[in-house]
């Protein structure tokens, strides 16, 4: 370290002695000594300044080296990030295109369903018109039936009045019949009484006749005794007169008995005939009344059956009309609801398509911005190379679109702490083919190519219990199986996604399930997933096959599989490394 040269004390008048004039040589030496001292001080200051500058330069050089390393790492990270984002963008574009195609297919299906619904609606309208015509016919028939019913009711009322009259007549006739029966009983009793009297009279007559004969005999005996006394001349006359008198008495008595008997028989026969005639008249009247009553009852029953049939037909017509109206209202509601759902789905599809188009435009904007940034970086590096007069390193081409890449980083420590990054990109075109089949209500809708999830969907309109169901994933010779819980039910039209444990998704049953025992579903060139029910029968399967083809020329990659970005990395200070596709970063 330089130090200042001490200056000897100057002699002057203050030294305590008389001043002596200095010689010119002494003065020149003193001046030279003063100049050397000043130069020595300046040199010391300069050396200190140089040392401080060197120290600062070393610190700045270290900062520059660290900044260069950080910049290189940031550039490498930015490149990897750009590649990842570009791959994600490409994948998103592919997904968007696939989703757009799917949405277009669904839109076509929706249009076809809409046309079919319009046809069904037109058919339902024609059915409605036919039903309305039938309804009017039924109403006309119902009106005619109502008129007939009113007429039948009027006839029924009149017949009921006639029936009441006939019932009254029947009651009267029954009363007359009872009186006739009573009279007949009385006449029968009278007949019996008369017969008894006749029998008693006959017996009395016989008794009297016997007594009369006894009297005659007694008289005859008396007359014989008298005849003995009487003259024999008058005996013949007397006997003649006696016989004549007896004969007259007998005839008179027989005539009286015959007259009395004839009178009794005539009276009996007259009363019996009157009773018989009265009974016959009453019987005929009762029979006619009964016949009229039966006819009235039959007519009333027929009218009642007709009335009940008409009422049944009327109720059936009303029920049919109500059923048709309910069915028509239900069909209208279903058609309106289906049209509303389809319109809402179409609006959602349009919104999704618009959102996807917006996302696609944003991705294009991001891609253009990244291209502009890459171009700006390239121009900046070229300007730095021209300014530093560095030879440009060979450009490395990076292909991002389903490309397999391998990267090796080699770090060499030396005097300048340089890091060499070597990249090699092997571009390839990858085609993915999917095949799926299902024999039941549940199908395998999607298999994630990264092995994060598998999605199932219930395509039916009924809930599907999946207790004991098993899903098997096969990749080559390896296979894993996932079993559903006994209470799990997949709702109608619902999808369920089974995520791997490392997918970074939280469980949200019943639509999102986490397989905690499996970190990934696995990836490979040939992935096959089989769904089996609780009986072990295969109900659905889906396979994904990756086919890799290497193009003949690397320049065709941009057109066939992705976006090609040329990226040149240059060394900003020092001599560039002479390695293929490499750059040296300070």
From Swiss-Prot:
Chain positions covered by the region annotation Linker 1: 70-81
Glycosylated sites: 399
One function term, GO molecular function aspect: structural constituent of cytoskeleton
Region (Coil 1A): 35-69
Linker 2, as annotated region: 216-243
Modified residues (Phosphothreonine): 3, 5, 20, 25, 575
Residue ranges of every copy of the LTD domain listed in the record: 430-546
Propeptide regions on this chain: 584-586
Pfam families, per database record: Filament, LTD
Phosphoserine carried by residues: 23, 28, 126, 158, 200, 210, 232, 278, 302, 375, 393, 534
Disease affiliated with this protein: Leukodystrophy, demyelinating, adult-onset, autosomal dominant, typical: A slowly progressive and fatal demyelinating leukodystrophy, presenting in the fourth or fifth decade of life. Clinically characterized by early autonomic abnormalities, pyramidal and cerebellar dysfunction, and symmetric demyelination of the CNS. It differs from multiple sclerosis and other demyelinating disorders in that neuropathology shows preservation of oligodendroglia in the presence of subtotal demyelination and lack of astrogliosis. Leukodystrophy, demyelinating, adult-onset, autosomal dominant, atypical: An autosomal dominant, slowly progressive disorder characterized by pyramidal signs with muscle weakness, spasticity, dysarthria, dysautonomia, and demyelinating leukodystrophy affecting the cerebrum and cortico-spinal tracts while sparing the cerebellum. Patients usually do not present with autonomic symptoms.
Subunit structure: Homodimer. Lamin dimers then assemble into dimeric head-to-tail polymers. Ultimately, two head-to-tail polymers assemble laterally into a protofilament with a uniformly shaped rod of 3.5 nm in diameter. Interacts with SPAG4 and SEPT12.
Protein name: Lamin-B1
